[in-house]
A protein has these predicted regions:
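Acidic/histidine-enriched segments that form metal/cofactor-coordinating
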Residues: 27-31, 104, 111-220, 383-401, ...
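M16/insulysin-pitrilysin zinc metalloprotease superfamily fold
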Residues: 101-105, 136-167, 315, 335-396, ...
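Short acidic/His-enriched helical or mixed secondary-structure segments at domain edges of catalytic enzymes
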Residues: 169-188, 266-285, 325-331, 342, ...
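Non-catalytic, conformational "gating/processing" segments within enzyme and secreted inhibitor domains
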Residues: 187, 197, 214-250, 446-449
Length: 473
């Protein structure tokens, strides 16, 4: 699931430079003879070679001249958090993390040493919609590295010692996370938006971690990793025919075993707004979250909604940041935006504020939510936002590894390969009326659930204007 909170340091630096005047005080007048901004350069859609193996595995090849390197991403649908059982939230994270920690042929050290000998590495990650197994190597070692990636993806052994170590590490990480109010707030946010839908189950629990065994991992791997629900993206200094031949050698005899996971159902879009106060004794600040259901990544509303969210809270110069931080001094940072997945999505807002201004901060959040939905975004502000979103996308997809990851990630959520080059023109085509309509539809104050993590004795009275809150320990 795309998290709008996860900004790269580069994007933050660009944002900070773009809005330095907001930090330093009134901006100096710019010279009148400065040239106009150049038009955004579209990201050219690469010439993608495509082939489907007999077992159903799709293979996309993106030949690129440049550094002598190849990058691989194997994307597997229905292998992510949404495939986890209701009593095993976050299981997919352990499964993905253990893929490269031992196979039927090698232990974890041998895997790491072999990958390093090829001039690269191998690993895996997971999101709500699927799993990603990735690797890279010098172009001269493209074959051996793809064989290793296939070994990791197809024949993980889940050794007892590695499973126990992963569990111990996960329990320590969970203990640290649960001490943070943001972790509790985000867990409550997902539950409020998605209810019993699998998209609510991305955070591990002590019970879900301790219940994992090598046998369970092997069984779930067989259910989740099927060739006919997978895509292999190959990018780098390699021609399509060579890549197809290597893919056939590494994956051609891959056969599904075990009953496959059922596809994820559509997420609800009509969740009743909730009011939750998560008690945190002695807290001197309140952690605020606002959220409501939104759209899937393939919905026509997705890009205009992303722009609305960016205007509202997606950069340092965004409206909620300028209001709550720069004007009011309530917080170090306030943000808002949209997250999309294959079967649904949500909008959310977030800030940590002093106890004394908890209610006032909510007032300012909703003032900005109402304003963006009731009046057009000025042309200059909208154009700046478009350039920020499009520019970040172009910068983020300069490297071939990023292109491979973007293609694989888009495929997981149902977007075609052409979307890689269509994104920037679609962003540029959005007008102020569309942004206003998206804001009015999805950021409407009356649609939002409110989650507050803080000391009820200090802030409960300030929440009365927002309805009756259920207090949870």
């Amino acid at each position: 699931m795309t998290r709008f909170f996860q900004h790269s340091l580069l994007a933050l630096a660009v944002s900070a430079l773009a809005c330095g005047a907001a930090v330093a005080g009134p901006a100096a007048a710019l010279p009148k003879d400065l040239p106009a901004y150049a038009a955004d350069k579209p990201l050219p859609v690469p010439d993608i070679g495509r082939k489907t193996l007999a077992n159903g595995l799709e293979v996309w090849v993106v030949p690129r001249d440049g550094i002598p390197r190849v990058d691989y991403v194997l994307a597997v649908r229905n292998a992510g958090y949404a495939a986890d059982a209701a009593d095993a939230p976050g299981f997919a994270a352990l499964l993905a993390g253990l893929l490269a920690e031992g196979t039927a042929q090698r232990d974890s050290r041998q895997i790491a040493e072999f990958a390093q000998a090829q001039g690269g590495g191998v690993g895996a990650s997971v999101n709500s919609d699927g799993a990603l197994v990735y690797g890279n190597a010098l172009a001269a070692n493209a074959g051996p590295m793809l064989s290793l990636l296939a070994e990791v993806a197809r024949t993980p052994a889940f050794p007892e010692s590695e499973v126990r170590l992963a569990q111990a590490n996960a329990l320590q990480a969970l203990k640290a996370a649960e001490a943070q109010p943001g972790f509790r707030a985000n867990r409550a946010l997902l539950s409020a938006v998605y209810g019993e839908h699998p998209y609510a189950r991305t955070q591990q629990t002590e019970a879900s971690i301790t219940a994992v065994t090598p046998a369970v991992l092997r069984s779930e791997h067989q259910r989740r990793f099927h060739p006919d629900r997978s895509l292999l993206v190959v990018a780098g200094r390699i021609d399509a025919d060579t890549a197809f031949a290597l893919a056939e050698q590494a994956f051609g005899d891959w056969a599904a075993s075990g009953a496959e996971v059922a596809p994820t159902a559509a997420a609800p879009r009509d969740a009743r707004p909730q009011r939750l106060l998560l008690q945190r004794d002695g807290s001197v600040q309140s952690t605020l979250r606002l959220a409501s259901p939104a759209v899937a990544a393939t919905d026509p509303d997705a890009i205009p909604l992303q722009l609305a969210g960016t205007v509202l809270g997606g950069s340092f110069s965004s409206r909620v940041m300028q209001n709550l931080r720069e004007e009011k001094g309530y917080t170090y940072g306030a943000r808002a935006g949209a997250s999309t997945s294959a079967q649904g999505g949500h909008v959310s807002g977030a800030a940590d504020v002093r106890n004394e201004v908890t209610g006032a901060a909510l007032t300012e959040f909703f003032k900005e939510y109402a304003r963006i939905g009731s009046e057009p975004v000025p042309a200059t502000e909208l154009d700046d936002t478009k350039r920020y979103v499009a520019g970040g996308y172009l910068i983020g997809n300069q490297m071939q590894a990023a292109v491979a990851a973007t293609l694989a990630g888009n495929w997981l959520v149902g977007l075609p390969p052409e979307y890689l080059g269509e994104f920037v023109p679609r962003v540029r085509a959005v007008d102020a009326a569309q942004v206003q309509a998206m804001a009015a539809k999805y950021f409407a104050p009356e649609r939002q659930s409110i989650i507050v993590v803080g000391d009820g004795g200090s802030v409960a009275d300030q929440l009365a204007d927002w309805g009756e809150f259920t207090t949870l320990k």
